[in-house]
Design a protein with these regions (language model features):
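Conserved phosphate-binding catalytic cores of ATP/NTP-utilizing and phosphoryl-transfer enzymes
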Residues: 83-88, 139, 155-208, 288, ...
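Glycine-rich phosphate-binding loop plus the immediately following alpha-helix
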Residues: 124-125, 202-246, 340
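Adenine-nucleotide phosphate-binding core of ATP-dependent small-molecule kinases
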Residues: 258-291, 331
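N-terminal glycine/serine-rich phosphate-binding loop of ATP-dependent small-molecule kinases
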Residues: 87-169, 308, 317-318, 322-327
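An N-terminal assembly and electron-transfer interface module characteristic of large anaerobic redox
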Residues: 1-92, 110, 215-223
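Active-site nucleophile and cofactor-binding loops and adjacent substrate-binding regions
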Residues: 120-121, 149, 165-174, 188-192, ...
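Glycine-rich phosphate-binding/hydrolytic loop that grips phosphoryl groups
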Residues: 220-223, 314, 327-345
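Glycine-rich phosphate-binding loops at beta-strand->alpha-helix junctions
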Residues: 155, 295-319, 330-334
Length: 345
């Protein structure tokens, strides 16, 4: 399949100083998977597989993967980075800037949550973060000058200038989940524009992760679009999906085609509950495929906004054959992890 001499590549793989491998291929190309699988079997070093189409549109997702990979191999907070506001009052902030919402958590020295906020991100990550932080401060009757350290995470993390450090949502979700339940070993996070599964060890460190960011299928955006098509709120969709009678299959892997399939089912006079069940099963199937790829085991925790969708949770639990741990702070998990890292600065 490769038409070039691979002698140099083989020599590189045998280099005793090799620490890790980043394997880059063209997006949606199936041919390279054979070589990747071979290298995965032969090498003991950590490996990260990246797929791109050489455009800048996917730069955010690629940056997240690369940074999370690097964070998994070294201490996230270096001693040289520790720079607290010495005039602060022992208050630590985590800001999770996502595609749909921006979440803020403020912790005190005892790791208690003193303020928490979830607001729509809006058109700009930086402006959305400022609004959410100001609201969190207002609710706790605090000022920015009283804050000791701030860590940002999420896809908009690098656009937020008020943070002392940015850390990927992969690492922050791992920290937040382990803090909430030290027995958790596999984390399922379904957000607005991607879904991810993270494996952690008995110290809470990331050992492996996979992300589905090729398209919106199986994400919160997918469910929002389908709810709009069915003229339902997400809350109604969550409840109605549990009352299904007919087991309908949504076969399309693409969000656009899935919407057309839903419109066709509506025309066939299928009930909304049955259609929603089919959508939930579709999301669960995509999620469980990620779990299989990462080798999910141990106790499972689900985080992100989709964890509030009872139908999706039920479908994932049935397919995995396990009970998912879902915290009251599930949607704030990334911000919580960021705030915990802020305490180390």
């Amino acid at each position: 399949m490769r038409m070039t001499d691979t002698a140099g590549r083989k020599q590189l793989m045998n280099d005793p100083h090799l620490k890790a491998v980043i394997y880059h291929t063209v997006k949606f190309c199936d041919y390279y998977c054979f070589e990747y699988s071979h290298l995965r079997r032969e090498l003991t070093q950590p490996m990260l597989k990246l797929e791109s189409d050489y455009t800048v549109q996917s730069s955010g997702q690629l940056l997240t993967r690369l940074e999370a990979f690097a964070e998994s191999m070294a201490p996230v907070v270096q001693t040289s980075e520790r720079k607290k506001n010495m005039n602060g009052k022992g208050l630590y902030v985590g800001i999770d800037s996502g595609s749909t919402s921006t979440d803020v958590v403020i912790l005190n020295e005892k790791q208690d949550i003193v303020s928490q906020v979830i607001l729509p991100t809006g058109a700009g990550a930086a402006a959305g973060a400022d609004r959410a932080l100001e609201e969190a401060l207002r609710q706790a009757n605090l000022t920015r000058e009283e804050l000791t350290a701030t860590v940002t995470t999420g896809y908009g993390r690098t656009a937020i200038q008020s943070g002392d450090k940015s850390i990927t949502e992969i690492t922050c979700h791992a920290r937040g989940a382990f803090f909430l339940n030290p027995n958790v070993r596999t984390i399922i996070d379904i957000g607005g524009q991607d879904s991810k599964v993270i494996r952690i060890d008995d110290t809470g460190n990331v050992t492996n992760f996979v992300m589905n960011d090729k398209c919106a299928a199986g994400t919160g955006r997918f469910l929002e679009l389908m709810a709009r098509t069915l003229e339902l709120s997400l809350e109604q969709m969550s409840e109605m999906g549990l009352t299904w009678k007919e087991d309908i299959t949504i076969s399309s892997m693409c969000t656009v085609f899935a919407e057309s399939e839903v419109v066709s089912l509506i025309a066939q006079d299928k009930t909304a509950a049955d259609i929603i069940h089919g959508l939930n099963e579709s999301v669960a199937s995509k999620t469980c495929a990620l779990v299989k790829r990462v080798g999910g085991e141990g106790e499972y925790m689900m985080t992100g906004g989709v964890s509030k969708n009872k139908g999706v949770v039920d479908a994932i639990e049935r397919k995995l054959g396990v009970k998912l741990c879902i915290s009251d702070a599930a949607q704030l998990n990334g911000a919580l992890g960021a705030a915990l890292f802020a305490m180390e600065l």
